[in-house]
């Protein structure tokens, strides 16, 4: 399986970007599959967005410079990296946790194993299991920097898992049949959920924000 993923190039999902492809994180730009708001753009769209994002990033740096990183943040990351490279008592490998992650999403979070169908009880189970895997990932061991990269890739994907689960749970309807079938809410609910479902990761918790749709022709820009 390949779940989880947030693919802005195929669906209406993706990270919130403005017209310059800036995300809500200052200095971070996105294009292609991770950039939301334009489904079915595929490779040509990714190439165009990549150029827009690159030019915007250059403009951002020229106007704002590169902010220095606080030494405390550097020390914290060095300590984390060293812990992955030195402790050898991990009960699981990165590959085992990745397979477990994919199994959880496939089975409980609307994955291919259930033909993209799910209910709230399954989502609760998925959320619980993904949090368990996230805790287990703290104790992983990397023999070299290549394996270290795999650990961080897994941890990022586990965060994406939590986001996918939170968004599926927040939209109490079925809007795109065959892509995601909410068995508890099998019908479309324009009255309550003809909206954007946004989220923010704040202090380790995902906060869901429902926003009204913007009519065609008008921009939907964020402000940091």
Spans of features found by a protein language model:
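Glycine- and aromatic-enriched mobile tails/lids
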Residues: 10, 16-30, 34-224
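Flavin-binding catalytic cores
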Residues: 1-3
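Short loop/turn motifs at secondary-structure junctions and domain boundaries
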Residues: 5-9
């Amino acid at each position: 399986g390949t779940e989880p993923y947030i693919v802005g190039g195929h669906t209406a999902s993706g990270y919130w970007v403005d017209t310059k492809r800036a995300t809500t994180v200052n200095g971070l730009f996105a294009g292609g599959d991770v950039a939301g708001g334009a489904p079915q753009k595929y490779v040509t769209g990714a190439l165009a967005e990549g150029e827009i994002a690159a030019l915007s990033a250059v403009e951002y740096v020229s106007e704002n410079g590169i902010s220095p990183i606080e030494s405390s943040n550097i020390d914290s990351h060095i300590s984390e990296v060293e812990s992955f490279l030195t402790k050898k008592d991990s009960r699981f490998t990165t590959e085992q946790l990745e397979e477990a992650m994919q199994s959880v999403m496939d089975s409980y979070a609307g994955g291919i194993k259930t033909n993209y169908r799910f209910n709230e009880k399954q989502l609760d189970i998925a959320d619980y299991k993904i949090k368990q895997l996230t805790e287990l990932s703290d104790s992983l061991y990397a023999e070299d920097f290549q394996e270290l990269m795999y650990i961080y890739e897994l941890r990022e994907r586990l965060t994406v898992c939590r986001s996918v689960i939170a968004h599926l749970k927040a939209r109490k309807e079925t809007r795109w049949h065959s892509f995601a079938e909410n068995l508890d809410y099998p019908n479309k609910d324009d009255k309550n959920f003809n909206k954007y479902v946004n989220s923010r990761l704040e202090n380790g918790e995902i906060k869901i924000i429902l926003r009204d749709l913007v009519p065609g022709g008008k921009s939907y820009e964020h402000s940091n």
